[in-house]
């Protein structure tokens, strides 16, 4: 009896990369390959890499090296793969190198070095494909690439311009996820609010209904499933205003992930980002008037070339007034190929780090203050896991997996992962909440 070929898989990077990995893993299983849990049990290994910032490049190169040392047969894909010379200069013995979102190229390389079985068992693959997330939540990628040319970013050079998935394809996948018991769908892309721009918002059909390829209509359709729908990577276009009433009405979660990046008009122009913080503050105020429960997550870059102390103080003033719920802050790091590398007046490393500390200290006060308001409230939570001490590790609508805070319920008797419960909040920290089941 012929041995079933086995493929090891290492997935690095962001949720978009994880979605690419899921597509490749689904194809591998559909063609009869087994997924090996360890290097020594695999006939070859696929490494899906990240290449966005220097630390990610280093992590990816280390992962490739480890796979080569442990197994010897490695196919590289993902964003670092778009810089093929970088991979081969360090690891010339890899079998093949492809870029991101390259399922067909990866499968071709796998076929070349590990021919597929003659009798694949397609029925071994669930309708929702192979998922890297827990069973109760899933990422739903609606597009690939980006039309923006932010000076600190090289995503368009790695993933190309915006290419929206057909609306019927996205909705069919969402329907399969909901039927399979997924309780939370996280909508991802490089620019979720640009969905359909490249197709001129082409009209599609789902279950006999006409549906426009556009973020608002997508949200309306996803809201029909009665599960959590969370929007990530939203660029602050004017039509984002249209989804706030959907959040107020409970069709999708009142949660917006909008990477504002900075508040100084000068710095934003250097970044080639929208440059009107007063307008942003006015919109945030309006959104909260329409939907008081709205939670806003954002990310910011400090120490960008040309950022002065005055620019940084303007940023601090912005976050104090905006009172965002969840915030990440990064010091600027040059990325090979980014046009920001050519900008004058780089900020010294010690100044970058000092500004990051000051920024996070201000935001910690804001986060703690906003979380204190939750004490005494009853929230619906989704259980991610029960830890070894019997505590339920949960999330509310305000918490995206892996990046936001958590809700802990210490007496988790009868609670199960992947289920919803009502919890009264009794305590908080700067980032997390503690509750008791109701």
From Swiss-Prot:
UniProtKB keywords: 4Fe-4S, Cytoplasm, Iron, Iron-sulfur, Metal-binding, S-adenosyl-L-methionine, Transferase
The EC number(s) this enzyme carries: 2.8.4.4
Catalysed reactions, as listed in the record: L-aspartate(89)-[ribosomal protein uS12]-hydrogen + (sulfur carrier)-SH + AH2 + 2 S-adenosyl-L-methionine = 3-methylsulfanyl-L-aspartate(89)-[ribosomal protein uS12]-hydrogen + (sulfur carrier)-H + 5'-deoxyadenosine + L-methionine + A + S-adenosyl-L-homocysteine + 2 H(+)
SMART domains recorded: Elp3
Domain (Radical SAM core): residue spans on this chain: 132-369
Binding site for [4Fe-4S] cluster 1: 14, 50, 79
Enzyme class: transferase
A Gene Ontology cellular-component term: cytosol
Binding site for [4Fe-4S] cluster 2: 146, 150, 153
Comment on bound cofactor: Binds 2 [4Fe-4S] clusters. One cluster is coordinated with 3 cysteines and an exchangeable S-adenosyl-L-methionine.
Domain TRAM, residue spans: 372-438
GO BP annotation list: tRNA modification
Residues of the MTTase N-terminal domain: 5-115
Subcellular location: Cytoplasm
InterPro entries: Elp3/MiaA/NifB-like_rSAM, Methylthiotransferase, Methylthiotransferase_CS, Methylthiotransferase_N, Methylthiotransferase_N_sf, NA-bd_OB-fold, Ribosomal_uS12_MeSTrfase_RimO, rSAM
The protein's required cofactors: [4Fe-4S] cluster
Chain segments annotated as coiled-coil in the UniProt record: none
Recorded GO MF terms: 4 iron, 4 sulfur cluster binding; aspartic acid methylthiotransferase activity; metal ion binding; protein methylthiotransferase activity
TM helices/strands, residue ranges: none
Function: Catalyzes the methylthiolation of an aspartic acid residue of ribosomal protein uS12.
Family: Belongs to the methylthiotransferase family. RimO subfamily.
HAMAP family attached to this UniProt entry: MTTase_RimO (MF_01865)
NCBIfam families: 30S ribosomal protein S12 methylthiotransferase RimO, MiaB/RimO family radical SAM methylthiotransferase
PANTHER family membership: RIBOSOMAL PROTEIN S12 METHYLTHIOTRANSFERASE RIMO, RIBOSOMAL PROTEIN US12 METHYLTHIOTRANSFERASE RIMO
Protein name as catalogued: Ribosomal protein uS12 methylthiotransferase RimO
């Amino acid at each position: 009896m012929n041995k079933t070929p086995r493929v090891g898989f290492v997935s690095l990077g962001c949720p978009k990369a994880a979605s690419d990995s899921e597509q490749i893993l689904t194809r591998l299983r559909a063609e009869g390959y087994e997924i090996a849990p360890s290097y020594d049990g695999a006939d070859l290994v696929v490494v899906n890499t990240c290449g966005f910032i220097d630390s990610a490049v280093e992590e990816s190169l280390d992962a490739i090296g480890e796979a080569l040392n442990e197994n010897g047969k490695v196919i590289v894909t993902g964003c670092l793969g778009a810089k093929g010379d970088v991979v081969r200069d360090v690891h010339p013995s890899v079998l093949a190198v492809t870029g991101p979102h390259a399922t067909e190229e990866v499968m071709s390389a796998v076929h070349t070095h590990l021919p597929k079985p003659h009798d694949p068992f397609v029925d071994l693959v669930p309708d929702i494909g192979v998922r890297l997330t827990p069973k109760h939540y899933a990422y739903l990628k609606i597009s690939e690439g980006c039309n923006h040319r932010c000076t600190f970013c090289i995503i368009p050079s790695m993933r190309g311009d915006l290419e929206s998935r057909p609306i019927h394809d996205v909705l069919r996948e969402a329907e399969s996820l909901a039927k399979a018991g997924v309780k939370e769908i996280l909508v991802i892309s490089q620019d979720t609010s640009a969905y359909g721009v490249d197709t001129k918002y082409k009209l599609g059909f789902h279950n006999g209904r006409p549906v426009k390829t556009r973020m608002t209509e997508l949200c309306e359709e996803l809201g029909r499933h009665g599960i959590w729908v969370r929007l990530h990577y939203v660029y602050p276009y004017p039509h984002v205003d249209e989804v706030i009433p959907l959040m107020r009405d409970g069709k999708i979660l009142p949660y917006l992930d909008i990477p504002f990046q900075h508040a100084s008009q000068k710095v934003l122009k250097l970044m080639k980002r929208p440059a009107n913080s007063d307008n942003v503050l006015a919109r945030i105020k309006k959104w909260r008037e329409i939907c008081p429960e709205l939670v806003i997550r954002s990310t910011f870059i400090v120490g960008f070339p040309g950022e002065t102390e005055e620019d940084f103080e303007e940023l601090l003033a912005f976050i104090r007034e905006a009172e965002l719920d969840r915030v990440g802050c990064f010091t600027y790091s040059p990325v090979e190929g980014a046009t920001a590398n050519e900008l004058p007046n780089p900020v010294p490393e010690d100044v970058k780090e000092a500004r990051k500390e000051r920024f996070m200290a201000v935001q910690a006060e804001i986060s703690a203050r906003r979380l204190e308001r939750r004490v005494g409230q009853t929230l619906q939570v989704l259980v991610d896991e029960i830890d070894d001490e019997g505590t339920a590790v949960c999330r509310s609508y305000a918490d995206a997996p892996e990046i936001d805070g958590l809700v802990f319920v210490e007496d988790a008797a009868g609670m199960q992962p992947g289920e919803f419960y009502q919890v009264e909040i009794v305590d908080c920290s700067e980032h997390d909440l503690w509750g008791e089941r109701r």
